[in-house]
UniProtKB/Swiss-Prot annotation:
Keywords: Membrane, Transmembrane, Transmembrane helix. Residues 24-34 have a biased composition (Polar residues). It is a multi-pass membrane protein. This is Uncharacterized protein CBU_1818. Signal peptide: none annotated. The keyword Transmembrane helix applies. Residues 1-37 are annotated as: Disordered. Residues 1-18 have a biased composition (Basic residues). It is found in: Membrane. One of its GO terms (cellular component) is membrane. The chain crosses the membrane at residues 172-191, 195-214.
Length: 481
């Protein structure tokens, strides 16, 4: 496969910002970058993180909560959910049961990691919190819907129709034949009944054969249409493949968490390159469809899947440590667990808001891909579908970044970026705005601790020094000097 220039730039490590490094270069360089530390829970997090500007060290806890609040509002908008919608109206929720309470619970988990020094008693009591219970309830609903979705897809996309009917529908076929014979027998006596039975049997078998022929033909053309997407391999670059595999990897990890007891520290994910590659083919294609062995894409997929296995093991280890450290064994590990490893993998360094927001967006991206897998391949090409996702990410980020700037900064004209407010006035204005917005927090806002947050974001100093500040197109979220 020819290596096309990647459109995505990403953070090469959690200590430095490199916006000029392609998402996938030579394997040796890729391995070297990965050895410097896992930046994200999956390769998709790197894609999401590339759109975000590092936040200044002067960021206060209050301002941080505003930032996260705006993001939760953007997420709710993406999910099609608003407080005015009827919670029972499934159509309004775009097929995903999640609301502000659930997102609030996610944020509380983030707050505890972003600010370990919160006042005693401010932390949630995980096993008693109403928001925790609500989050678990929504998870169960979503998980149930996801299972039904997968089961329905498997039912309609299984190409082994003939074997399935012969193996599992024998009784039904016999019943149809017997019914035809029974109608004939009761309608015309023994002789006429035998003839009618023969006719009924012939009609039944004829209909069955017609159905099988139609289904086989349909599967054949679906397969041919899928193969057309791979006729020109240079149109599918490494970036697209990484995005697809990342979504599948996230989905697979969720299914593993669902069936395992997280109290066992020795637990290992059963993810391996072969199984991930098999999942890729079985979900995004018909089960009978296999990529031609001569295509380099197969080798590329296996290489990426192998690295996904390494990443998954490390993520899983850190998640176990997080659960044990926070005495949260009683909480079932569900979908929101995917966002924890992105900032909990290294307890020695404070996490950045960049990673936090990237993790949230990537989590929803993977979930969206999983729920939409049914007609993904046949409805749109890879390029159109993924470009739509990229555009949505960029648009969402720009929208709420601009809203933050509009609230926190007053300028003398639209082109000026100079704040006319003193720090104290700015803080008062922020507090006033927060009160009007009704932040989704169960408790009162913690006091602003500029000193602690200077330390919290000290790890960003090196990033800030190395960031490209000369470009006027960079969207800044600078909140103070």
């Amino acid at each position: 496969m020819s290596r096309l220039p990647s459109k995505t730039k990403y953070h090469s490590s959690h200590r430095s910002l490199n916006r000029k490094t392609p998402l996938l270069q030579r394997s040796s360089e890729t391995n070297s970058l990965r050895e410097s530390g896992i930046e994200t829970a999956s390769s998709q997090l790197s894609l999401a993180a590339s759109s975000y500007t590092p936040i200044d060290e002067e960021m206060t806890e209050l301002e941080l909560k505003i930032y996260l609040f705006l993001f939760t509002r953007a997420l709710n908008h993406k999910l099609g959910y608003t407080q005015e919608n009827n919670p029972d109206d499934k159509a309004q929720k775009a097929g995903i049961d999640i609301n502000l309470d659930c997102l609030n619970y996610l944020l509380e988990i983030l707050y505890q990691n972003l600010e370990p020094q919160l006042e005693k008693g401010a932390n949630l009591s995980y096993h008693k919190s109403s928001t925790a219970r609500k989050a678990l309830e929504y998870h169960e609903t979503l998980n149930s819907r996801l299972k039904k979705k997968i089961a329905k897809d498997a039912e309609h996309k299984n190409p082994l129709t003939l074997l399935r009917i012969l193996n599992t529908k024998t009784t039904s076929i016999s019943t149809l034949i017997g019914t035809g014979g029974g109608i004939g027998i009761t309608g015309a006596g023994a002789i006429a009944g035998s003839a009618a039975a023969g006719i009924g049997t012939a009609v039944t078998v004829g209909v069955l054969l017609f159905y099988l022929c139609w289904r086989t033909t349909s599967e054949y053309w679906k397969k041919k249409n899928a193969e057309k997407l791979f006729e020109h391999t240079d149109q599918i670059d490494n970036e697209n493949i990484i995005e697809l595999v990342s979504a599948l990897s996230a989905f697979y990890i969720v299914k593993e968490f669902e069936h395992k007891n997280m109290q066992k520290a020795s637990l290992k994910l059963s993810l391996n390159p072969e199984s991930l590659f098999e999942i890729f083919q079985n979900i995004y294609h018909n089960k009978s469809f296999r990529l031609p062995s001569q295509l380099p894409i197969q080798k590329e997929l296996k290489a990426i899947a192998k690295q996904a296995k390494i990443d998954a093991d490390k993520i899983h280890t850190h998640l176990i440590e997080y659960v044990n450290t926070n005495k949260a064994q009683s909480i079932s590990i569900n979908l929101y667990a995917l966002i924890i490893p992105s900032f909990a993998y290294n307890s020695e360094e404070s996490p950045t808001v960049v990673k936090t927001v990237a993790a949230l967006h990537a989590w929803l991206w993977a979930l969206d891909k999983t729920l939409d897998m049914k007609d993904f391949l046949f409805r749109n090409s890879f390029e159109k579908r993924l470009e739509k996702v990229r555009a949505g990410v960029v648009k969402t980020m720009k929208t709420f970044k601009e809203e933050v700037n509009n609230v926190l900064l007053e300028t003398d004209d639209s082109s000026s970026g100079v704040s006319l407010l003193a720090d104290e006035d700015k803080t008062d204005r922020v507090k006033e705005w927060v009160n009007k917005q009704k932040l989704p927090s169960p408790g009162a806002l913690s006091p602003i601790k500029s000193a602690s947050h200077l330390a919290l974001f000290s790890s960003l100093r090196e990033q800030k020094d190395k960031a490209v500040n000369s470009s006027g197109s960079r969207l800044s979220l600078r909140l103070g000097n």
